[in-house]
Amino acid sequence: MAKKSMIARDVKRKKIVERYAAKRAALMEAFNAAKDPMQRLEIHRKIQALPRNSAPNRIRNRCWATGKPRGVYRDFGLCRNQLRERAHKGELPGVVKSSW
């Protein structure tokens, strides 16, 4: 189990990303459309003025059952240990043990 403070920090980041998503997208669109270097610099400064945690790449992909940050399968949102346990118990529909 991950530290509760790390899980809480990630939840906080998700909320901040959601809050600033529209503003960040509009600034990025304007930045990509701008041709003048000075105009691009001005827009870049506005992007840098946004909170650091409002960038979506700062969100860590975590297991929803344990909060572990590593070995997480995107399709299930589970870490490899939980995926294995739940697959053996039959709690994941459509997941079967492979044999060939």
From Swiss-Prot:
Disulfide bonds: none annotated. One of its GO terms (biological process) is translation. Transmembrane segments: none annotated. It comes from the Bacteria. Part of the 30S ribosomal subunit. Contacts proteins S3 and S10. Binds 16S rRNA, required for the assembly of 30S particles and may also be responsible for determining the conformation of the 16S rRNA at the A site. Belongs to the universal ribosomal protein uS14 family. This is Small ribosomal subunit protein uS14. It comes from Prochlorococcus marinus (strain MIT 9313). The lineage of its organism: Bacteria, Bacillati, Cyanobacteriota, Cyanophyceae, Synechococcales.
